[in-house]
Regions:
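Bacterial N-terminal signal peptides that target proteins for export
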Residues: 1-8
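Bacterial N-terminal signal peptides
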Residues: 9-17
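N-proximal helix/coil linker or "cap" segments that precede and/or mark the start of modular domains
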Residues: 16-40
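A short beta-strand-turn-helix
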Residues: 36-58
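Short pre-active-site segment immediately N-terminal to redox-active cysteine/selenocysteine motifs
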Residues: 57, 64-67, 139
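Conserved redox-active cysteine motifs that mediate thiol-disulfide chemistry
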Residues: 63-80
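Thioredoxin-like thiol-disulfide oxidoreductase module
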Residues: 101-139
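Thiol/disulfide oxidoreductase modules built on the thioredoxin-like
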Residues: 125-166
Length: 179
C-alpha cells in the first residue's frame, strides 16, 4: 500500500479547515511577539507594524539561516510564492525565525533573499523560545504552517517537503471562496 503523499495530506488539512476570508482575531501565537517584529527597509531592519499580518488565515513560520545551503536554495521559491499571491483575505503570511549566529548574519540573509515579510528581531529570539520549541521541527529549512489559533497544520521535514507545503498553500489561495 502506498503512503499518501504530502500534497494529499495538505489537501485534506485545508479541506477540513473552517476558515473565514480573514481571521476574526489576531494570531494567538504571534500576537504576543508583534512588538518584536522587524522588516527590511532599505539597508536595515526597522520595526514592523501591521494588524492585517496578524489576521492571516495561515501563517508560515520559516526557520532558516544564511549559513544553511538548503535554506539559500529554498528561500527564492518562498519569496516568489509570497510575492505572487493575489491580494485579499486568503493570503498566507510568513514570519522569519532566524537560526543565524548573529544579527549581521540574519540581516545579510534577509537582504540577499529579498524577504519582504517580517522577522523576529535577532535580540528578541530568546524571548520566543516557545515558538522554536513547538514549531521548529528537526532541521532547517523548516516551514510550519499554523492557523490563527496557533494550531500546527503542517510542517516540512526537508527543503523538498517545504516546496510541497508552498505548492499546497498556493493552490489553496487560488481556489474561489465558497459561500
Amino acid at each position: 500500500m502506498k503512503k499518501p503523499c504530502l500534497a494529499t495530506a495538505l489537501g485534506l488539512v485545508f479541506a477540513c479547515q473552517n476558515l473565514s476570508p480573514a481571521a476574526e482575531v489576531p494570531n494567538a501565537i504571534i500576537a504576543p511577539h508583534a512588538k518584536d517584529l522587524v522588516v527590511l527597509q532599505g539597508e536595515k531592519l526597522v520595526p514592523f507594524e501591521s494588524a492585517q499580518f496578524l489576521k492571516a488565515p495561515y501563517t508560515i513560520i520559516y526557520f532558516g539561516a544564511g549559513w544553511c545551503p538548503d535554506c539559500r536554495r529554498f528561500s527564492p521559491a518562498l519569496v516568489q510564492a509570497y510575492n505572487q499571491q493575489p491580494n485579499g483575505a486568503d493570503r498566507f503570511e510568513v514570519l522569519f525565525f532566524s537560526m543565524d549566529k548573529s544579527a549581521e548574519g540574519m540581516l545579510k540573509f534577509i537582504k540577499s533573499e529579498k524577504m519582504l515579510w517580517p522577522a523576529l528581531a535577532f535580540d528578541k529570539l530568546p524571548t520566543a523560545e516557545e515558538l522554536k520549541k513547538y514549531y521548529s521541527g528537526h532541521g532547517i529549512p523548516c516551514l510550519s504552517v499554523i492557523d490563527p489559533k496557533g494550531k500546527l497544520l503542517l510542517q516540512s521535514k526537508s527543503d523538498q517537503d517545504a516546496q510541497e507545503v508552498l505548492n499546497a498553500l498556493q493552490d489553496q489561495a487560488r481556489k474561489p471562496e465558497i459561500k
